[in-house]
């Protein structure tokens, strides 16, 4: 039986473990600061989504006007 892919599998497993460790380290620190930064990120995402929806609404209205 060939076992040539053990090294590759070990690398993949280690990369996954390192990603999880990095994610956990990101969650460390002052919870209040993290909560504020997360809230700011969500506000930015929401503002972008609102702007996109508004642009889509304007495009839809323009398309309806040109049909008439």
From Swiss-Prot:
The modification Phosphoserine is found at residue 37. It is found in: Cytoplasm; Nucleus. The keyword Nucleus applies. One of its GO terms (cellular component) is cytoplasm. The keyword Glycoprotein does not apply. Residues 1-68 are annotated as: Disordered. Keywords: Cytoplasm, Nucleus, Phosphoprotein. It holds the Pfam family SERF-like_N. Residues 1-43, 50-68 have a biased composition (Basic and acidic residues). Present with 876 molecules/cell in log phase SD medium. Belongs to the SERF family. This is SERF-like protein YDL085C-A. The lineage of its organism: Eukaryota, Fungi, Dikarya, Ascomycota, Saccharomycotina.
